[in-house]
């Protein structure tokens, strides 16, 4: 319907070159930035809409299609590492990506001490149990700053809605540019620490007996399975 198509166009104009004298804000290195929580979510979801607009709704308007495609490509490339930090906001992608994503399951923490996971120092510093390959995190603030700490979850959180539009944009890229699967992906994971161990001590002892206190410790960070 022409009315909804026009609303679609107005939305994308606001996110690209501006509409009605207004335009989306940008980080210094060029990311279209709506607000702090999930800045990459908003940008990559709009990138998906831009791909749809370029390939379907406005395919007969060469100038608009080019503008929307360029916006979508640059936004996705920003997420992949084409930014002033030279860092990918997609976990496990590229030579440099964030290390402290806010995702409890992949952290493998068996207690509530997980604030230093992904850090190189601190009482609880250790790597995540699992690399959450392909997940998009929240993203930078308006200055382009990013804090790679689990506790700063406005930057590091992984959420379903953060990844929905991003995944759709990836599908649009594959449809548009093609691609192939990596036969060596994902790599085989090995436990990063001892998963199962015993702790025992003498609880009490007398001339005729010795009472042992023993604990079987399960620090596995894997899904339920037969051991």
Q: Which role does the model predict for each range below?
A:
Residues 1-21, 33-188:
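Aromatic (Trp/Tyr) and acidic
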Residues 24-26:
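Helix-rich interaction surfaces within compact, conserved domain-sized segments
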Residues 28-32:
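Short linear capping/connector segments at secondary-structure termini
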Residues 182-205:
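Glycan-recognition and catalytic regions of carbohydrate-active enzymes
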Residues 206-225:
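Short beta-strand elements of extracellular/lumenal beta-sandwich folds
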């Amino acid at each position: 319907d022409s009315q909804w198509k026009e609303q679609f166009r107005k939305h994308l104009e606001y996110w690209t070159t501006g509409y009605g004298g207004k335009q989306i804000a940008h980080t210094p290195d060029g990311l279209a930035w709506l607000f702090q929580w999930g800045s990459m979510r908003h940008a990559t979801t709009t990138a998906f809409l831009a791909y749809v607009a370029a390939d379907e709704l406005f395919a007969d308007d060469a100038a608009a299609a080019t503008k929307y495609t360029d916006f979508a490509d640059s936004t996705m490339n920003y997420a992949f590492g084409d930014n002033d930090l030279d860092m990918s906001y997609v976990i496990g992608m590229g030579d440099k990506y964030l290390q402290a994503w806010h995702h409890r399951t992949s952290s493998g923490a068996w207690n509530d001490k997980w604030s230093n996971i992904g850090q190189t120092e601190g009482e609880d510093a250790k790597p995540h149990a699992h690399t959450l390959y392909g997940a998009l995190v929240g993203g930078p603030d308006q200055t382009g700053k990013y804090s790679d700490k689990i506790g700063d979850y406005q930057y590091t959180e992984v959420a379903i809605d953060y990844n929905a539009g991003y995944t759709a944009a990836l599908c649009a890229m594959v449809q548009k540019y093609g691609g192939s699967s990596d036969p060596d992906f994902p790599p085989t994971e090995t436990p990063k620490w001892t998963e199962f161990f015993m702790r025992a001590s003498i609880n009490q002892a007398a001339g005729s007996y010795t009472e042992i206190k023993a604990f079987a410790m399960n620090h596995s960070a894997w899904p339920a399975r037969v051991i």
